[in-house]
A protein has these predicted regions:
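Acidic, metal-coordinating catalytic segment for phosphate/diphosphate chemistry
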Residues: 76-120
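The catalytic Nudix box helix
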Residues: 131, 145-181, 196, 207-213, ...
């Protein structure tokens, strides 16, 4: 009898621990406020009776849509749905500005719990912007992009900038200016990524991670990049290959606009 009781209760204990981890995670300062639905915001619920109501209401809506009972229960479950070494997929119980209870999913970079999740860099060399010719697994295509990457645990923003710049281009950072932050997809991603404008020097060999597919670094003028952005793609010929690369990087588009509006390329060198 005791054996079967342990078998029955053990998954419940594991779920309770996981749910407590979730509640602690969503109240981390860097993930933003819980919100107030009475002020027109989507409010995250942390009291268990309200969370249960949000789950139940969501499950009922799914059942009305014809979703199978087991899936409806699974798809309405609040908490940490999945995680790996890089990401959390979480589902929050919320109350919408309409007063209706429900759930809402978010994807979090784990590095954003203690600070900025990563860094994007607009490196300047001889008044040109250095970009990566990068093959991306997610899009299954060649892309023209700014150098960027995740921030390591306990790493400052400046250290992350210096490391990513060195790894992806081989250059050293001379001086820098924070252009701002970008929300890549505010509908699902919680992470806000800073973009840094910098002058670079002392080129060496790239030291890319084994999982990266950066073919080349290319220095282009602001006008060349604006034209490529308007076209949506460009033909890139390098000593290694000639490819048709897409030009649609949101980090690059944001940086180009900031650089142009601030007239940074015509300004004196940064101090």
């Amino acid at each position: 009898m005791i054996r079967w009781l342990i078998i029955f209760l053990f998954p419940m204990i594991l779920f309770a621990d996981s749910f407590n981890d979730y509640l602690k995670l969503i109240q981390t300062k860097n993930l933003g406020p819980l919100g107030n639905h009475q002020q027109g915001e989507i409010e995250i619920l942390i009291k268990e009776p309200l969370i249960q109501k949000a789950q139940t209401d969501t499950e009922k809506r799914l059942l009305k849509k014809g979703v199978a009972s087991k899936l409806a229960e699974e798809w309405s479950r609040v908490g940490i749905i999945a995680e790996d070494s890089y990401l959390y997929w979480i589902r929050d119980a919320v109350i919408f500005p309409s007063g209706i209870y429900g759930t809402y999913d978010r994807i979090l970079w784990k590095s954003c719990v203690e600070g900025p999740p990563g860094i994007a860099i607009a490196p300047i060399i001889h008044k040109k912007i250095l970009v990566n010719l990068n093959y991306r697994h997610a899009t299954r295509s060649w892309e023209i992009e700014l150098p960027r990457g995740i921030r390591n645990p306990h790493e400052t923003l400046l250290k992350a900038c210096e490391r990513e710049l060195y790894e992806e281009t081989g250059y050293s950072l001379k001086n820098h200016l924070l252009l701002g932050t970008i929300a890549v997809d505010s509908g699902i991603l919680s992470s806000l990524v800073p973009i840094v404008y910098c002058h670079i020097e002392k080129p060496t060999e790239r030291h890319s991670d084994f999982s990266e597919a950066i073919s080349d670094n290319i220095a282009l003028t602001l006008e060349e990049l604006e034209h490529a952005l308007l076209q949506g793609c460009c033909t890139v010929a390098t000593p290694k290959r000639t490819v048709q690369a897409h030009v649609r990087d949101p980090f690059l588009a944001y940086a180009l606009l900031q650089i142009k509006l601030r007239r940074l390329l015509s300004a004196p060198l940064l101090d």
